[in-house]
Amino acid sequence: MSNKQTKFIWVPAILVVILLGMIFYSAWQRRETKVSTSKNKITVVASLDSYGEMAEAVLGKQGTVTSIINKPNMDPHEYEPTANVAKQYQKADVIVSNGGGFDNWSLNFAKQNKTAKTINLARLYNYKDGTSGGNEHFWYKTDLTTRLTNQLAVKYSQLMPAKKTYFEKNAKNYQKKAEKLVDLQNQVKTRLNGKKLLATEPVFDNTLLALGADMQDQQFARAVEEGDDPTPSDVREWQELIKRGQIAAVIDNPQATGKLAKQGVDYAKAHDVPIVEARETKPAQTSYITWQMKQLNALNEALQE
C-alpha cells in the first residue's frame, strides 16, 4: 500500500518539475530572442577607407564599419594585418575588398569567414589580375559611387530584409551627394579629351582614360608602380615628349619614392609642364568625394595653363 502511495506522490511531483522547466525555458527563450533582436546590427569591415565611407553611408544606424587602411601614410601593398584585424574580419557580417592583387590579405580573411557577405571590387568590375593594361585602382572608377553603394544596399538587405528600403534610400542619398563629382568629371572631360598626359604611376588612369585622356609612355608608369626603374628607353621617351611640347600635364603620385620618378617630375617642371598630384590613399580628414574633386579641379586648372 505504501508503494502505491509513493508512486501517486511522485507522479504529480515529476509533472510539476516538467511544467516548471517548460515555463523557465520559454521565459529564457523569449529573453534570448529579445537580446538577439536588440543586437541585430550589421558589422562591416572594408580594406580601404574610401570604401568604408560608402559602406557607412549606406548602413546608417544599422551597424558599424571598420576601415583597415585608414591613414594616408599606410601602404596597402606592404600592409601586414595584426591578430586584432584578423578577429575583426572573422566577426564581420559584410566584407569589402579591393581585389585585383591589391589587398590579398583582405581577400584571404574574407575566404576564412564562411558566413560573411563579401564584395570584391575586382569581380564587380570583371577585372582579371595580370591582364595587360589592367588597373586595380578601382576607387578611381568614375561610376564607383553608384556601383558600390548599390551593391552595399543589396548585401545589407540580404541580412536585414525589413530595412531594404532604408538601405536603398541611403545609397541614393550618397549618390545624390556625388552628383557634383559627376558634374565635374563631365566638365573636365570636355578639356581633357584627346590631351596627352604622362604619369609617374598609373594610379589615376581609371579616371583619366574614362574622361578621354591619351596616356603616354605607360611603361614608365608601370615600372615605377612595380618598384622597378624605368628603362633608359622609357626615360628618353618621357623627355622627348616633354621637349616636343606634346604633354598637357604630368600626373604625379606624391607617395611614389622612385628616384627616376622624381627626376621625371623635375624634368617636366623645368619645361613648364603642369604637375597634378593624384594619391593612392585618401588624405586624412577628407571625404572621398572632396578628395576626388580636389584632384580633378587641379587637373582642370592645369589644362587651362
Predicted regions and their residues:
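Extracytoplasmic metal-acquisition and chelation regions
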Residues: 2-305
